Amino acid sequence: MSVSELLENKKKLVPRSINTLYQSGKEAVHDPDAAIQDIITQGKDKKIEPKLDGLAAKAKGIDWPTLIWIGGMHLAALAAPFYFSWSGLAICLVLCWVTGCLGVTLGYHRLLTHGSFVTSKPVRWFFAFVGGISGEGSAIVWVANHRKHHRFSDQDGDPHSPREGGWWSHILWLFPKHSSDEIQAHCKRWAPDLAKDSGVMFFHKTFLLWHFVIGGGLLATGWAIYGLDTGVSWLLWGLAVRMVYVFHVTWFVNSATHIWGYRNYETTDDSRNLWWVGLLAFGEGWHNNHHAFQRMAAHGHKWWEFDMTYWVILAMERLGLVWNVVHTPRGTGQTASPESGGAVVKSA
């Protein structure tokens, strides 16, 4: 569906006060209008914002736990072909969709970062959980990094701009060492709404635990049913291979879609639409569209820009699990025509 078609079928959202952000109930569970946009668009606060970005971060030393975590998963994934099983592959594919599409793309990104729709606390906590078992960090850390990326996209302050190197934007930005005080201040600065969410903070504090629970469960279940080799297969394919896949398709959004591809809209950053990232990353590869209309639930704006995650959101809306979905473009603070919803349409 094109942007013009979306505008013709425009659905109005009633703005609510920021005070409703933390209230429970269907009418006021999450208020992206007042809270999230204020967080993303506000200026730097030198008193509480640590330097967690750019070249300056590279001099802080290495975060060895993160390096070992990511490196270990890659090494384990290399062993997976020696323990191949069709059941292991099936588990891998299902969990890729659950953690990548539902967890990272729909939950972490479109709901918790940008507030593209409203849902209940239990559903939001479910997305925080399945996003966490993707292995990409807890919801509050992920969201804080991504909101900061939008505030300073491809400028000084962007945590992972390819202007500082393709490998930096893809993976190396994850490895500089930061103190717990810096990380806490970073999350307070960029995700204060999530810091006050008890469910999100529970999964933040128990982030590592769930990986041991799931890994142990896969190993034990496969072993009990089919034998040790199958248990190892389920562990390697259901944990390591799945995690490495979701890692890289997410990282390609940070790197590749700011380097290659085409642009439907003129934005102040280097964002691009890249078809193969769109397919692999459940619709996240239409990144120029997203940077033009950050709160819009649909990232694919042309009929052929396949966006699986938006289809899931539509299905959940039909079932009454989510509501106030941002179907139409809403302003990004840029000066533009009404037809573009806040971005400048690039001429053909």
Regions found by a protein language model. Give the residues of each.
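Non-catalytic, topology-defining segments of multipass membrane proteins
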Residues: 1-251, 296-348
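Short glycine- and Lys/Arg-enriched binding-loop motifs that mark or flank ligand-binding interfaces
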Residues: 99, 103, 257, 279-281
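Catalytic glutamate of the conserved HExxH
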Residues: 110, 255, 259, 291
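Active-site-proximal inter-transmembrane loops
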Residues: 190-198, 260-286, 292-293
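C-terminal accessory segments of proteins
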Residues: 246-264
